[in-house]
Amino acid sequence: MKLNSYHALNQQMISHTCGNGLKICVFPKAGFKRAYAMLAVNYGSIDISFTHDGELYTSPLGVAHFLEHKVFEQPDGGNALQTFAKTGASPNAFTSKTMTAYHFSGTEKFMKNLEILLDFVMSPYFTDENVRKEQGIIGQEIGMVNDRPSWRVYENLMSAL
C-alpha cells in the first residue's frame, strides 16, 4: 500500500494495485457522512480496437456506452438500480472518451453497496432480447445528443484536431 499526501488540497490518498492489475484508491474524509465508490475501466467511446493475448480485436462505435447501460440488467429481470435502492444508495454511470465508470454514494451499508457494484459490473447479464431492447434506447440517446448544438460544435472541434 502506498500513501500519497496532497498538502495543497489537505488530502491523502491510499492506493494499492492488486495482482490482477485492479488499482484501488481510498480518499479518507474525516467528518463526512456520505461515502462514495467508483469502478472505472479504461474503455471509452474512442476505444474501438484492443489487443488480447497478441490478437487484435475491433468493436463497433458505441460499444462502451452500450455496455455502460447493459451491465445494470440482472438475471431476475430487475436491475442494479433497484438493488441499490433497497440499500438507500444512489448509483449512476458515465462513459467518456477514454473510460467507463460506475459509481454510487450512500450514508450506510457501504460494503454491501460495494459488493453490489462489483457484482453487476464484473458479472454482466446478456440475452438476445435485452440486447435488442438496449440498442433502441442507445439510438434514442444518440438522437437527443445530436439535437444539442453545443455538443455538435464540440464534436466538430474535436474531429478537426
Each language-model region and where it sits:
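Acidic/histidine-enriched segments that form metal/cofactor-coordinating
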Residues: P75-L161
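His/Glu-rich zincin catalytic helix
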Residues: M1-N79
